[in-house]
Amino acid sequence: MRRGLMGWNAEELPVATLEARLTRLRAAMAKASMDAFVIYTNNTRPSAVHYVTGFTPYWSDALMLVPKAGAPVFATALSKRVSEWIRTTDPLSEIVNTPKPGALMGERLTKDNSVKRVGVLEYDTLPSGLADDMAAAAPAVEWTDGTAMFTGLRREVDQSERGLLARADAMAAAALGEAEAGKASDAGTLAGLIEQHARLAGAEETYIAIAHDLAADRRLNRTSQPTPLQDRFAVRASVAYKGCWIRRTRTFAKDAGAAKADSWFDGVARSLEPGKPIAAQLAAKLKELPGAALTSWIAESCTGSYPLSAVASSRAPGKDAPVNGQFLVLTVELTLDGAPWLGAAPLIVGQGAL
């Protein structure tokens, strides 16, 4: 269950922005010959519903129905006592409390005789109980996967989303500064200090992972144990603000190599170009960092119901040309003069850092 404050701020996320997103979604639906669109959500898959409505699901299963016209319908198994709170964070939808969201979705669809074909985001991962209930209540409907359509819609961010991402990034960057303050000598204490800093700044959720001895093990782990920090360690902060997630990773070391790699990586994040393979861009940029060898990289973005998912990586060459205006979190692992270094930062392709 989420622990941070969740609320809707009309200045940060105006109703006009949500209405514009809904209009774009309906235009994409029409182009794909979909008469309605269904999105499944829970506490680990909140992002698609948040993008359309502003509401961040925090527990339980729920379904959202986007019809061709009229208000979206958000059907949740949560009790009625939270309905009013949901309404304060979702200014567009009709909120319905029901123990069987799938059956309700199907019943709503059958009331409109023009509905023949319905898209479902990430159809293959829709829980079978909900899928069965929808199909039983609307046996004449043709169900189809709408993931590609929605992914195309999410390739560019609007100004409101960019502002929320920038706010989350500022929280993460400032919180990681706790590692420079010398307040902690062990991983558990440092993780607590970083999380505390981010939450007091307004973070909705945080996940802190640490590689306490980067020279021995590059894996980043969530920990509360008093494991001593070594001369070279790395910290990753995944932070959410108003439903928008970012990641930052930094390497901390007593030598000057980490700072040189940080400066290089900042330039990479600010200069990533659209239409060109990320692998080729990194290879070219690596020439500007003498003594460096690239180990791996991954680019993540929010394209569906999950906050961040891999969209390109060093494991899948040839499919990594980003789109102008696309939000990415770029993570790079390299060695500099034989010493390991990890870094991650958010960016907008073709427009630089957030």
Q: Which ranges hold each PLM region?
A:
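Active-site neighborhoods and metal-handling regions in enzymes and metal-associated proteins
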Residues: M1-L354
